[in-house]
Amino acid sequence: MKTPRIPIAIQQAVMRSLREHLANANRKLERRYAEPTLVYQQRGTSAGTAWLEKNEIRLNPVLLLENQREFIDEVVPHELAHLLVWQHFGRVAPHGKEWKWMMESVLGVPARRTHRFELASVRQNTFPYRCRCQQHQLTVRRHNRVVRGEATYRCVRCGDLLVAEK
């Protein structure tokens, strides 16, 4: 799937949010953390990821376009908090007490681990499989592993091997 183009006005709003939150953090923490690089190449159902060693934030362009205000207000500071926590505390739990403190006390944003965006447009195709108690939907990746003989999957409820439906 081709990555959608983000209009310049939205890119500017994302950058403004990033810079405002970073400036607040630098002021409150009395530090001068460098501005991270923004990349609009996150795919799948993740809204964003923070690449700690690269000081980079990857954002999902599809979810950004569909949820502009909430995305800018929540996802941008969420990923920035991961980078700041790593630089301030070192390696700690991704959504642990340090991250929660950074989100709420430093950035002034509610600490939510996951987004609540509609995912229909980014959810990948699934393949129906069956056990004796229910139907399951396997992702393309898992389905291909089954087809190649690299993996088998069992139902967590009944323990049966999952079999592709015809």
Curated annotation (Swiss-Prot):
Task: Outline the extent of the SprT-like domain.
Answer: 20-164
**Cofactor dependency:** Zn(2+)
- Record-linked InterPro entries: SprT-like_domain, SprT_Zn_ribbon, Uncharacterised_SprT
Is Plastid tagged as a keyword?
Answer: no
Q: How is the cofactor bound?
A: Binds 1 zinc ion.
Kindly state which keywords UniProt assigns to this record, in alphabetical order: Cytoplasm, Metal-binding, Zinc
- Molecular-function GO term, any one: zinc ion binding
What domain of life is recorded for the organism? Bacteria
Q: Where in the cell is it found?
A: Cytoplasm
One GO biological process term: response to stress
Q: Please list the residues that bind Zn(2+).
A: H78, H82
Q: Which HAMAP family match?
A: SprT (MF_00746)
PANTHER family referenced in this protein's UniProt entry, alphabetically? PROTEIN SPRT
Family, per entry: Belongs to the SprT family.
Any idea what this protein is called?
Answer: Protein SprT
From which organism does this entry originate? Klebsiella pneumoniae subsp. pneumoniae (strain ATCC 700721 / MGH 78578)
Q: Which gene encodes it?
A: sprT
